């Protein structure tokens, strides 16, 4: 059975989230496919974005005027620099220079990214049980736990204000929240989603939204 790891069912009608044990602002945003910055703004939460058990968080469904203005500025900047995507769909060096992405494991991609049909918000990479999983870039661990249904033992790493990466279905987590990690540093060990299904579920999220990791990872 392919690993789909769509995460918890996204409830379009959900307007609030009550903080559970183990939640972080980043994991809450990840659960609902939202930008953590918008949730922070909607709830007047400042860095380092501490949330509390049973706290009721408003889920930002629309951007505030300030966020919209910031988005427009970013869009104008991108327009001036061009989209920066090559013919094969990968980012040009100028667009990906800020984050030097690397493959978290060396295995073959067995299930690709798709947001239609049987949704897969990342890629599933074949591996060996207990194989080391490396961080795809420098960053800070913002979630390490098993509180998101469909992901098993999950690690989320923040690489910038816009980009997060996620590593799911692990046998073991080797980092804790707040740890700074270097590109390639081992963060977990590959687990299994069922018999003969030893693989890593890997995602890249930009402003809270899942993106095809193959756009960012180096070709091989």
Region locations from a protein language model:
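Short, surface-exposed ligand- or partner-binding patches at beta-edge/loop junctions that are enriched
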Residues: 201
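Short, solvent-exposed mixed-charge patches
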Residues: 219-220
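Short aromatic-centered micro-motifs
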Residues: 204
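Extracytoplasmic low-complexity/disordered linkers and repeat tracts associated with LysM-containing
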Residues: 1-156, 160-163, 172-186, 192-197, ...
């Amino acid at each position: 059975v392919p690993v789909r790891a769509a995460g918890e069912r996204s409830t379009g009608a959900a307007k609030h989230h009550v903080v559970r044990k183990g939640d972080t602002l980043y994991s809450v945003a990840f659960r609902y496919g939202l930008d953590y910055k918008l949730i922070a703004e909607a709830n007047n939460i400042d860095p380092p974005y501490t949330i509390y058990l049973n706290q009721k968080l408003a889920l930002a469904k629309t951007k505030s005027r300030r966020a919209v203005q910031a988005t427009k500025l970013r869009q104008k900047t991108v327009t001036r620099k061009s989209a920066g995507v090559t013919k094969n769909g990968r980012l040009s060096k100028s667009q990906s220079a800020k984050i030097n992405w690397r493959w978290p494991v060396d295995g073959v991609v067995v299930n690709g990214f798709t947001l239609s049909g049987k949704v897969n918000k990342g890629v599933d990479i074949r591996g060996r049980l207990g194989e080391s999983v490396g961080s795809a870039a420098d960053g800070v661990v913002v979630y390490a736990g098993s509180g998101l249904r469909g992901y098993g033992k999950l690690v989320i790493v923040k690489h910038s204000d816009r980009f997060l990466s996620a590593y799911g279905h692990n046998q073991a987590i080797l980092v804790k929240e707040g740890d700074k990690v270097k590109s390639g540093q081992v963060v977990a060990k590959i687990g299994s989603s069922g018999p003969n299904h030893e693989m890593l579920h890997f995602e890249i999220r930009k402003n809270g939204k899942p993106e095809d990791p193959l756009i960012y990872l180096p070709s091989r």
